[in-house]
A protein has these predicted regions:
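S-adenosylmethionine/decaboxylated-SAM
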Residues: 2-12, 18-200
């Protein structure tokens, strides 16, 4: 698997963490499809896609594509390339579609909805859920509560941006991680700020 080709894709997934995503996707997708919350332009999605291909599994990736709080105008991660002047809003969907076609990652299925709304209509089990959407505590915890029951026993929950020290980063993903450990999950593996938990 040549995953170095994803290095230049717009996104916030460091290569060594993306490499871990690919490995976990390859392992857990043997038992079913994978669901990602928080697509942005699809960098992490491509890592997941590459790992799942050998098992002929799909990656369902959910995002409203109007950006998180930090992507908006005058915020830290505002990016002119994904700003749609015709609507005066962030729109990362066109770049995601471009990346899917560029890398022929046709096992990626974009879902343009709010995560919690999509979960209400979702009935199929998944082998792995990757939470990397909004990093507010309410949103991150809602993502966990909405999708936790969809993960099969022995499946994986992956959470990005885990910082024990508040000075290094936001605490919402870390709180969700600790909550999951108290609610049916155990540590499986960690690479820097991305952690994989296994569901009992």
């Amino acid at each position: 698997m040549n995953i170095k080709k994803f290095t230049g894709v717009k996104g916030f997934m460091p290569f060594h963490e993306g490499e871990a995503l690919t490995k976990w996707a390859s392992l857990f997708s043997k038992n079913g499809p994978i669901l990602e919350i928080g697509t942005y332009c699809g960098k992490s999605t491509l890592f997941l896609s590459e790992g799942s291909k050998k098992n002929n599994q799909f990656i369902y990736t959910i995002d409203h594509h109007t950006g998180s709080e930090e992507h908006q105008i005058n915020e830290e991660y505002f990016d002119e390339e994904i700003f749609d002047r015709s609507t005066n809003k962030i729109n990362s969907l066109p770049l995601l579609i471009k990346n899917i076609n560029l890398f022929k990652a046709y096992n990626i299925v974009p879902i343009v909805r709010e995560s919690s709304i999509a979960a209400k209509d979702w009935s199929s089990p998944v082998s792995m859920v990757f939470i990397d959407g909004s990093h507010s505590l309410d949103s991150a915890m809602q993502d966990f509560k909405s999708w936790n029951t969809k993960i099969i026993s022995g499946g994986a929950l992956v959470i990005h941006d885990i910082y024990e020290n508040p000075e290094e980063g936001g605490q919402a993903p870390y709180h969700v991680y600790k909550h999951a450990l108290q609610n049916g999950y155990i540590d499986f593996e960690r690479v820097d700020t991305i952690v994989c938990l296994k569901k009992l």
